[in-house]
A protein has these predicted regions:
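Short, ordered loop/turn segments at secondary-structure junctions
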Residues: 57, 85-88, 114-117, 133-144, ...
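N-terminal amphipathic alpha-helix/helix-capping segment at the start of soluble metabolic enzymes
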Residues: 16-54, 169, 173-175, 311-361, ...
């Protein structure tokens, strides 16, 4: 099967791939076979474990503060410490930071983070173990201009890049320094954008241009990354990168990260949707979870994500499915038929599990977005209100909103209650006589067979609740969707995941975001049903809507694209993010970027509706999409000015 991978503007730069083997086996867990790259005392790629890294948030010129923070990170599990070096003076001070760490007994490799300043990179490469460069701004300036290149002028630009980049490569060769070539979706050069657009293909070509220069100079100590704040784009870019590397005989290690993931639950969900999906594919040799929190808080999250794969290869074997109807390089929604308000063109639905509760009262539904006003005898319904409630054997003795469906086990089904539907197991389904009424069928992936497909094709009122007990859950479920699609079974499918064995709330967040988000990102599934014994009903509902928000399949709240703080940051990111969120969190569907400096400014906010960017000490610049609209605003008044800007463009509504 041939896969079309598109550039944004000119079809002549589209490419066709005759293979989609971004992993050796999309059904059974196998790690991507990358070459080993040495970074100081540790190996990355090859047979090495997946490494954990993070980045300091201190001023690089404050040696002791940077050392103390680095130690906290290392003791939390950080195996590579990245430090910003925006100019030569910061690059020079890396030597002092390294010396102090060694004096205290810490030999963890250091990584210099470079933007715009080749001379800083060249100096850093002589002092520490690794440098990171962004091909979008190492040799090019970004003016957001679309430039028409002939083939001759485009090649001459590549010659200019080679001239600018080659000195760093030669220094790295001489000193045994490793390099990460890290593309960011939001900071592609105008040259790349003019040919490929802000596409995964553009991200891949941006990095490979630099890799080809390295290979021409016989330098191979390279690690690659394809970061984006949108997990869909990030996943597609990494998969495409692996295939393109295979075509060119490369197998460099991969560093995984979702850039500007944010804070709290949202940051963890978005990170797991992106990073976790690729780890399921066996991709990834190092990981950073980018949270707008203290950097030492990132390590436990990354470790929980990575540790899930230590023994994954022992899972029950999954049978391959042919043909594969899923395009791994482009998002396509697989539309099912519609039953009730599930499937068809409806947004994915959320089912809340109340089956473990001893009793259910009107006030119990507050946790899933329904607030009863007794004095008015009315229900207020929030944007993140569950669509269905599963009662199991329980009953309700009060009236509920008409928008909330009730699912009960067949033996306890209150068939006289409106909006009440039975949940059947496979044996019950085979003998169920009322298939003209909407009903739910809970099955395991291994229950699927031709006889069941035949029954389902004839049953226009059945919603499938699909579950698995395979340790390699997401690919097992993906294989089931492939079988259903190939067998022309068009019933809507709810993705059911049970995490009763987990005792850690954060693990439930991360695992569910990986398992369910990975499927939604491939256009699979018409709803979410999470069961566990760890989260309360409110947290589980919030997690479900958070996964839908992160996969952009159902928007129920404001989205914040906020970078993790670093030494370039010009204000307190955590405090500022909290202030912006407090004023704007009711603006459903808006995306607001909060960036600590101009490096992570307009580029990384490419996807945002509004931007709040530090451009000097105590000074903020506001953006509408990519355009600067207000400059040099004192930070004391900047949140008020942001609210006024949102009002000016007609996107403001008063809080309820």
């Amino acid at each position: 099967m041939r896969y079309l991978v598109k550039s944004a503007f000119q079809s002549k730069f589209d490419i066709y791939l005759d293979m989609a083997n971004y992993t050796k086996d999309i059904f059974n867990y196998t790690r991507y076979e990358s070459r080993e790259v040495r970074v100081g005392k540790i190996g990355i790629g090859g047979n090495n474990p997946i490494r954990i890294q993070s980045m300091t948030t201190t001023d690089t010129m404050d040696t002791m503060a940077t050392v103390e923070q680095s130690i906290r990170m290392i003791e939390a599990g950080c195996e590579l410490v990245r430090i910003t070096a925006p100019s030569i003076k910061e690059a020079r001070n890396l030597e002092n930071i390294k010396a102090e760490l060694l004096k205290r007994g810490y030999d963890t490799p250091l990584v210099a983070d470079i933007h715009y300043t080749p001379k800083a990179a060249e100096l850093a490469a002589t002092l520490i173990e690794k440098v990171r460069v962004n091909p979008g701004n190492y040799a090019d300036k970004k003016r957001f201009e679309e430039i028409e290149y002939t083939e001759e002028t485009y090649l001459s630009e590549l010659d200019r890049i080679r001239e600018r980049f080659s000195p760093l490569v030669n220094i790295c060769k001489e000193h045994g320094t490793a390099m990460r070539i890290g593309t960011n979706h939001g900071s592609l050069s105008d040259r790349i954008l003019s040919r490929f657009g802000d596409t995964p293909l553009g991200m891949v070509e941006s990095a490979l241009e630099f890799v080809r220069i390295c290979e021409d100079l016989d330098y191979h100590q390279i690690i690659l990354s394809m970061k984006a704040s949108n997990p869909k784009i990030m996943i597609e870019a990494y998969r495409l990168l692996v295939v393109k590397m295979q075509e060119e005989g490369m197998n460099y290690p991969l560093h995984l990260g979702v850039t500007e993931a944010g804070e709290g639950e949202d940051g963890r969900i978005k990170s797991a949707v992106g990073i976790g999906t690729l780890l399921e594919d066996g991709l990834g040799d190092t990981v950073r979870v980018s949270l707008t929190e203290e950097p030492e808080f990132e390590m436990p999250v990354a470790i929980k994500l990575v540790d899930r794969y230590k023994n994954r290869s022992g899972h029950k074997k999954i049978e391959a499915v042919e043909p594969n109807p899923i395009d791994p390089f482009e998002y396509n929604v697989f539309r099912s038929a519609s039953v009730l308000n599930i499937g068809g063109t409806n947004v994915p639905r959320v089912i809340s599990d109340y089956s473990h509760r001893d009793a259910i009262f009107q006030c119990s539904l507050i946790n899933i977005g329904y607030v009863y006003k007794e004095e008015l005898d009315k229900w207020n319904i929030k944007d993140n209100a569950s669509d269905y409630i599963y009662l199991g054997k329980n009953k309700l003795d009060f009236d509920i909103p008409g928008t909330l469906g009730v699912i009960q086990d067949l033996a306890h089904w209150d068939e006289n209650r409106s909006n009440s539907y039975p949940l059947l197991n496979l044996d019950e389904y085979r003998t169920f006589k009322r298939k003209h009424l909407p009903h739910f069928l809970k099955i395991m992936v291994d229950d699927l067979n031709e006889a069941l497909y035949d029954l389902l094709r004839k049953d226009a009122q059945c919603v499938i609740v699909l579950s698995t007990d395979n340790a390699h859950a997401m690919p097992h479920m993906r294989a089931a969707f492939m079988r259903l699609i190939n067998s022309k079974v068009n019933n809507p499918v709810l993705i059911f995941r049970n995490y009763d064995e987990l005792k850690d709330e954060e693990c439930v967040q991360l695992y569910a975001s990986t398992d369910i988000g990975g499927l939604l990102n491939e256009g699979l599934g018409q709803g979410i049903w999470i069961s566990d014994k760890c989260l309360n009903c409110h947290s589980r509902n919030s997690l479900s809507f958070g996964i839908l928000q992160a996969t952009r399949t159902r928007i129920s709240k404001t989205e914040y694209i906020s970078c993790p703080s670093c030494g370039r940051t010009l204000f307190d990111l955590q405090e500022t993010t909290a202030k912006v969120r407090a004023r704007t969190q009711h603006l459903k569907g808006l995306k607001i970027g909060i960036m600590g400096c101009i490096v992570n400014g307009p580029g990384e906010m490419a996807d945002a509706d509004y931007g709040y960017v530090g451009t000097g000490n105590g000074v903020i610049t506001l953006y509408k999409e990519k355009e600067v609209v207000k400059r040099n605003i004192p930070s004391l008044h900047a949140v008020d000015e942001l609210v006024e800007l949102i009002k000016q463009y007609g996107d403001w509504v008063d809080p309820a």
